[in-house]
Structure formats: C-alpha cells, structure tokens
Amino acid sequence: MKITIQEQDQTIEVKLEGRVAGPWVPELRRVWAEKAPQLATKTLSIDIQHVTYADAGGKQALREIYAQTRARLIANSPWAEYLAEEIMQIHERA
C-alpha cells in the first residue's frame, strides 16, 4: 500500500493505493494518528480510487477514520464506490 498526503490551507487529502490489508493496516492507523491532530481547522478527503483490496481490518480502520471525521471519500471505480458506500453505510447503522 502507498499512502500519499497532500496538505493545503483548508484541506488534507490522504491518497491510498494498493491493498489496505494485513501489515498495511497498522501503517494506515499510524499515519492517521499523526495527521488527526492537524484536522482541527482542516477538512479531510480520502482518495480510495486506486485501492485494489481492503480486508476486514482495513475496512474497519477506514470506518473509524470516517466516523471521526466524516471525510469526503473520493471514488471513481465500481470497487472504490462499493468500498465507500460500505464504509459510510456501516457507520450510519451504528
């Protein structure tokens, strides 16, 4: 998995590429823990367009980030759109 972070005055965009699974889930959580304090005055976007797979742990990590931030999820492929809907719907049912 590759994580790219782009920061601007009002936003932080986290771009994820590859598999959000296995040993990469703790890395996503670590990066999130570092960036979360900076969100007080910024909005978060998570670009999942190039995510090819997310296991249960990866989906859970993304759900937790979404639950804390209501981040804008960027998805333009059927898989990414499915993943985005799954993340948002599960949060809304909770």
Please place each PLM-identified region on the residue numbering.
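Amphipathic alpha-helical interaction surfaces in cytosolic regulatory modules
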Residues: L16-R93
